[in-house]
């Protein structure tokens, strides 16, 4: 995941074609299907699938479940095709999705917190055809807003971004608009949640993060949270 700081004048450009909004999210298979034609990859996917069935039988099946071969392959790639590590990490991710009730998240369920404008999916893909998740830091007030609502909005928007992936694309772009960021917007706990979500449950989905117009105060705050980043 690449991190870059942009001044206001050089905000990334977006193409002029509007992407369709959706309320029901189905993550497109992209080129994972093509990769699975590799005999070695296919063999490893089946090994993980069998391991999950034998050792984590209580986990759900279906899309984003223990028999979802696209998801299995993605976690194998994340774990450098180590079957044991992929099965372990994926089992925890599936259990988390179940506990967090990810499948029940809807536009309506996050409507109130979304109306603050603190985060949203941009209407356009970026110039590399990646869905764009925008965070407006100056609208985040941890002392006045329910952290559980913030977490649900975060996961809902990640799911929404992934549902907009064009065929052949697998990653999204994150933009943090830091104009007006102050001490009242700093939230160490929420950033910890954000890092953990992308590392454990959506690994390698966030390809790049751009910080726009970062003030000095944020740079000091970032020095404290940067050690939390995992490769």
Regions found by a protein language model. Give the residues of each.
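SEC14/CRAL-TRIO lipid-binding/transfer domains and related phosphoinositide-recognition modules
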Residues: 2-204, 208-212, 217-231
């Amino acid at each position: 995941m690449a991190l870059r700081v942009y001044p206001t004048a050089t905000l990334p450009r977006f193409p002029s074609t509007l992407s369709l909004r959706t309320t029901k999210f189905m993550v497109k298979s992209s080129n994972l299907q093509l990769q699975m034609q590799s005999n070695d990859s296919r063999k490893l996917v089946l090994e993980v699938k069998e391991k999950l069935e034998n050792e984590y039988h209580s986990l759900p099946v279906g899309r984003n479940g223990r028999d979802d071969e696209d998801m299995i392959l993605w976690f194998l790639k994340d774990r450098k095709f180590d079957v044991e590590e992929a099965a372990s990490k994926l089992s925890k991710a599936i259990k988390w999705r179940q506990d967090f009730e990810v499948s029940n998240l809807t536009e309506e369920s996050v409507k109130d917190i979304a109306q603050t404008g603190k985060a949203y999916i941009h209407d356009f893909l970026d110039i590399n055809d990646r869905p764009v998740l925008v965070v407006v830091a100056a609208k985040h007030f941890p002392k006045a807003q329910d952290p559980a609502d913030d977490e649900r909005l975060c996961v809902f928007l990640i799911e929404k971004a992934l549902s907009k992936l064009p065929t052949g694309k697998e990653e999204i772009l994150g933009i943090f608009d830091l104009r007006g960021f102050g001490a009242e917007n700093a939230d160490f706990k929420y950033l910890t949640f954000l890092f953990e979500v992308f590392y454990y449950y959506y690994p390698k989905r966030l390809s790049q993060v751009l910080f726009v117009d970062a003030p000095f105060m944020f740079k000091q705050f970032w020095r404290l949270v940067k050690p939390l980043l995992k490769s």
